Regions:
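Helical element adjacent to the flavin cofactor pocket in flavoenzyme catalytic cores
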Residues: 142-189, 193
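Conserved dinucleotide-binding and phosphotransfer motif residues
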Residues: 24, 111, 162
Length: 208
């Protein structure tokens, strides 16, 4: 099977990429090494949709997604991804914790994130179940949470509806170059898939 873009990995990144490419009329093939789409960390995580505590290099994309993608994602995918924007507390109970949290908050705020340091009492007003041991916290009211399984499967189903092809149980073991460009993908079972042009997206290249 040939496609303009071959995506190695059927996690949320691969499924989201397939959705957006197919939406724009690009032929897409997704190869997933396991038997199930989203079988790894994409569907087995806490579901945090957060800006706080991130590497500043990630923040422009994360901030864009929180402003323009997550609030409407359920409608886009025709799937309830259970997205809630209820804020994020990062807690501390020692002076060392406070120093770390202040650094994280300052770096994020410098990038435009709505995040600030608050006292333990302020944190307990937000979440009354917190221990009295909490003495400080960073608070980002625009952070939230979503269901990672529903989000991944929502992208998968909509990508298929738009014409993307998915094959599970096909572990990629080799990329073949033709005239200096990656043009073929070889799987453990011996199947060879060809890229129609020169596009190749590898969200899980380190795992293959």
């Amino acid at each position: 099977m040939n496609a303009e873009v071959i995506i190695v990995g059927g996690g949320i990144i691969g499924c989201a990429a397939a959705y957006n490419l197919a939406k724009n009329g690009v032929s897409v093939l997704v190869l997933e090494g396991s038997e199930n789409i989203g079988n790894g960390g994409s569907t087995r995580n806490g579901g945090g949709v957060r800006q706080s505590g991130r590497d500043p290099r990630e923040l422009p994309l994360v901030m864009y997604s929180i402003q323009h993608i997550w609030p409407q994602l359920s409608d886009m995918l025709d799937t309830n991804v259970e997205y809630y924007q209820e804020g994020n507390l990062r807690l501390g109970s020692t002076p060392q914790h406070q120093k770390i949290l202040e650094g994280l908050a300052d770096r994020a705020a410098a990038c435009g994130v709505d995040v600030r340091m608050i006292s333990g009492d302020e944190a307990r007003r937000i979440n009354p179940y917190l221990s009295d041991a909490v003495t400080c916290a960073s608070w980002c009211p625009t952070d939230g949470h979503a269901n990672p399984l529903m989000a991944t499967m929502g992208y998968y189903k909509m990508a298929r509806r738009l014409g993307a092809h998915f094959i599970s149980g096909e572990k990629v073991v080799e990329l073949r170059k033709i005239k200096g460009a990656a043009r073929q993908v070889v799987t453990e079972s011996g199947n060879v898939y060809a890229v129609s042009y020169t596009h190749l997206t590898l969200p899980t290249i380190l795992r293959v």
